[in-house]
């Protein structure tokens, strides 16, 4: 089973690809792991950027949601707008 921290690392990497390399993940106020992910199974990450540096995310395999939650992002200058 892929550890939850590895999934969250993938979520952070997806956010950096979308928002830019100067952004970093500063916290996860809410995370729910709903199903295990087996190594080698493909999954997709959907992101929804909100106000105040809050990003909602959903991780899904072909047939189920495996994790969802929200994270806080910041730049070197502070919270993302």
What is each of the regions a protein language model found here?
Residues 2, 28-30, 57:
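Aromatic-residue detector
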Residues 7, 17-18, 26-27, 64, ...:
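Generic ordered-secondary-structure signal
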Residues 11-46:
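Hydrophobic beta-strand-centered segment that forms part of the acyl-chain substrate-binding groove
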Residues 39, 48-81:
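HotDog/MaoC-like acyl-thioester-processing domains
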């Amino acid at each position: 089973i892929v550890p939850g921290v590895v999934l969250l690392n993938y979520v952070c990497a997806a956010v950096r690809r979308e928002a830019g390399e100067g952004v970093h993940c500063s916290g996860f106020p809410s995370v729910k792991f709903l199903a295990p992910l087996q190594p080698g199974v493909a999954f997709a990450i959907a992101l929804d950027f909100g106000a105040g540096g809050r990003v909602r995310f959903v991780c899904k395999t072909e047939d189920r949601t495996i994790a969802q939650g929200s994270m806080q992002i910041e730049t070197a200058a502070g919270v993302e707008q």
